[in-house]
Amino acid sequence: AYQIAIVIALLPLSFLGDMVGYRRIYKIGLVVFTITSLICALSRSLEMLTLARVAQGLGGAALMSVNTALIRLIYPKRQLGRGMGINSFVVAVSSAAGPTIAAAILSLASWQWLFLINVPLGIISIFLAMRFLPPNSAASKITRFDLPSAIMNALTFGLLITALGGFAQGQSGYLVLAEVIAMLIIGFFFVRRQLRMPVPLLPVDLLRIPIFSLSICTSICSFCAQMLAMVSLPFFLQTVIGRSEVETGLLLTPWPLATMVMAPLAGYLIEKVHAGLLGAMGLLIMACGLFGLALLPSSPSDLDIIWRMAPCGAGFGLFQSPNNHTIVSSAPAHRSGGASGMLGTARLLGQSSGAALVALLFNLAGDSGTHTALLLAG
């Protein structure tokens, strides 16, 4: 429910960001996320928790939809790469620390504290946003919000994510096929409507820019490859070579740690090296690490796994900062929100596709699914 809420709301909220200002959308997102976190913790039924998670997803989507647009607004053009690098660093830290912090909370308290911890953090973030975020950007030429486009967007991407999730969870093939067919039909009319809009909610105007569309495609592929590895490897580590859950978590940690190191460095290097060259180098290093993982010996040592995981994370970090920089900077300034929303959508589509592919490969190849997934990711 949380992920679907995010993916259906990213583009409409980024459109509103271009229309009314990124600062306003970001602050609203913080307020909604904080309040709904409290409601999640106080939920007394699964239905109430599900509804609260949907609302929380809308708040999270507001934050994601204008995040990189705000970075572009805050940083001077010559230092935009550093801003993207810092943002990628924060994402990597969250990915590395989140599961560990969640496990620590659950070992000491009830599940409600997974949501309650967001409340003080959210309140602090709201005050910081009010104090430090720059004023709303000047209004763009967008004069109205097209509700039919938002509904068609929600149905198209909602059905796509639901179909991918259902496929990964082994739902009826007929149900998944029906969802895909419905998605294609609605998506066709959605795209046709966007092509007639002066400022489209689905940024087809930006997708006509070759470097923008190429960067979006590579972003989807990179997150798909990441999920192919990060979802399939735990099965291999625990089922095939018998590592414990704690050991598995530690062996996966070099990936985000290496990303934490490389992402800000890549952001700095953008000022000196062409972003396309940095991104290509990052993808090459990541691919080498993934192929190395696919060729693991039958009884690998911890070091065998660690030295292969590290280049995966390093390459991922070296790619993300310049690629995100290219996506945002290639869009006109008044369409930064659309570029930011498309970047978040690409990430979620890549992650969902990767998880669905892992399920398919394990159904087809059994225990050797990890090997196939890593080869495909590379």
Residue ranges and their predicted role:
Residues I8-A9, I39, A62, V93-A97, ...:
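Residue positions within transmembrane alpha-helices of multi-pass solute transporters
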